[in-house]
Amino acid sequence: MGLYDRDYARGNSYAYETTSRSDSQIISFVKETYKLFAASMLAGAAGAYVGVPMAGTIHAMFLPLMLLEIGLLIGLHFVKHKPGINLMVMFSFVFMTGLMLAPLLARTLGMSGGGTIIGNAFAMTSVVFGAMSFYAIKTTTDFTSYTKPLMIALLVVVGFSIVNMFLGNPMLSVIISGAVVMLFSILVIYDTQNIMQGAYETPIDGAIALYLDFLNIFTALLQLFGIFGNNDD
């Protein structure tokens, strides 16, 4: 799940806050970041499209595929300055996140009105992401200083998510999904401001941060809409 990968890019944001960049360099950095983010969205969608027909196989191989996904993310950290290879690893990772989302998508499609549920979740995610991005640009509040409380909140959510993997409590699932939506909505603001300040080391760092924000919000909303929108007994 993207939730467990979210630390990747944030670690670089405050490590490079003091990097001196001119206004023109920051503008170029922002443009490149959002181009990569858009391309990542397409690659993730391609992974999901390929994965849905073989959702059962992906579910059965969840652990090795998850380890591969994490391995690609870690590997990206070491090759992000190597042209060509960095993009290949980045898109491989993003494609894998789409594959890993396929079982949830397939399960939702199997519900009554499943296609509508997925469409609504994506539309709501886009609205939330766009609104938070706009707010990040317009607000005078500096969310980049909230690294520590956001990290603590993330660890708490991850901890409860792991616990609920064993408990399988539906009510706790709802609470966790709601918390994920709220937390990653704030992280959209946090990451957007870091990108606008040129705080990330590379555009790939910023693009992956935004992509994981979007992915986690979408996944959480899809789970919530699936729970409340499933009328099958």
Where in this protein do the model-derived segments appear?
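A hydrophobic alpha-helical transmembrane-helix feature that marks the membrane cores
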Residues: M1-D233
